[in-house]
Curated annotation (Swiss-Prot):
Catalyzes 2 different reactions between oxygen and the acireductone 1,2-dihydroxy-3-keto-5-methylthiopentene (DHK-MTPene) depending upon the metal bound in the active site. Fe-containing acireductone dioxygenase (Fe-ARD) produces formate and 2-keto-4-methylthiobutyrate (KMTB), the alpha-ketoacid precursor of methionine in the methionine recycle pathway. Ni-containing acireductone dioxygenase (Ni-ARD) produces methylthiopropionate, carbon monoxide and formate, and does not lie on the methionine recycle pathway. Its EC number is 1.13.11.54, 1.13.11.53. It comes from the Bacteria. Disulfide bonds: none annotated. This is Acireductone dioxygenase. InterPro entries: ARD, ARD_bac, RmlC-like_jellyroll, RmlC_Cupin_sf. The record marks D102 as: May play a role in transmitting local conformational changes.
C-alpha cells in the first residue's frame, strides 16, 4: 500500500499528515506538481532480474510512456538483498539531489521511499509495485531502498545519458525517517 507522510522541514519527528488512499496521495502530490499513478505491473519479475528481462516484460507500458511523454532512454534499477553494491547504491541515492529532467519511476516489484523536499515541506512517498511516480525537473529529493533492498523500477529519461544527479550538499535527508524506520 502506498503511503504519503507530509512534514514541515523543521519538524522531521512529526508528520503533519499521513495519507494511505491513492486518490488522496495523488491529489496532494499533484498540488506540488508530482504525479503518482497506479499502473499494472503484473508481469512477474523479481529483485535482481536483468534489465533486458524487465524491459521485455514491460515493453508495452514503456512504449506508451515514451510516446506520450517524449522519453528517449529507459533503464532498470534492480536491487536485491544480495546485490554486491547495495550499500554503495543506497548511500548514493540517500543524499539530497535534483535532476535537470523529470525523474520517472515505474515500480514493478518491491518498494522504496521517495522523499521530496519542496519549498519548506517534505513529502515522503512510499512507492510499491504498480506505482508510477513522476517528479518534476529541479525537485530536491532522495530515495531510500532500505537496509535489505528488494525492488525493481523502470526508469525513463529525456536525457540520452540517463541518470545524472546534481547533489545539493544539504544533510536534510539524515534528519527524516528512512524506509526501515
Amino acid at each position: 500500500m502506498s503511503v504519503l507522510s507530509v512534514y514541515h522541514e523543521s519538524r522531521p519527528e512529526q508528520p503533519l499528515k499521513v495519507l494511505t488512499h491513492l486518490e488522496d496521495i495523488a491529489a496532494t502530490l499533484a498540488e506540488v506538481g508530482v504525479q503518482l499513478e497506479r499502473w499494472d505491473a503484473s508481469a512477474p519479475v523479481a529483485a535482481g532480474a536483468s534489465q533486458e528481462d524487465v524491459i521485455a516484460a514491460y515493453r508495452p507500458q514503456i512504449d506508451r510512456l515514451m510516446a506520450e511523454r517524449g522519453y528517449v532512454t529507459v533503464d532498470v534499477i534492480s536491487v536485491s538483498r544480495d546485490h554486491p553494491q547495495k550499500d554503495e547504491l543506497r548511500a548514493k541515492f540517500l543524499d539530497e539531489h535534483r535532476h535537470a529532467e523529470d525523474e520517472v519511476r515505474f515500480f514493478v516489484a518491491g518498494r522504496g521511499l521517495f522523499t521530496l523536499h519542496i519549498e519548506d515541506m517534505v513529502y515522503a512517498v512510499l512507492c510499491e509495485k504498480n506505482d508510477l511516480i513522476s517528479v518534476p525537473a529541479g525537485t530536491r529529493h532522495w530515495f531510500d531502498m532500505g537496509e535489505q533492498p528488494s525492488f525493481v523500477a523502470i526508469r525513463l529519461f529525456n536525457n540520452p545519458d540517463g541518470w545524472t544527479a546534481q547533489f545539493t550538499g544539504e544533510r536534510i535527508a539524515d534528519q527524516f525517517p528512512r524506509l526501515d524506520d
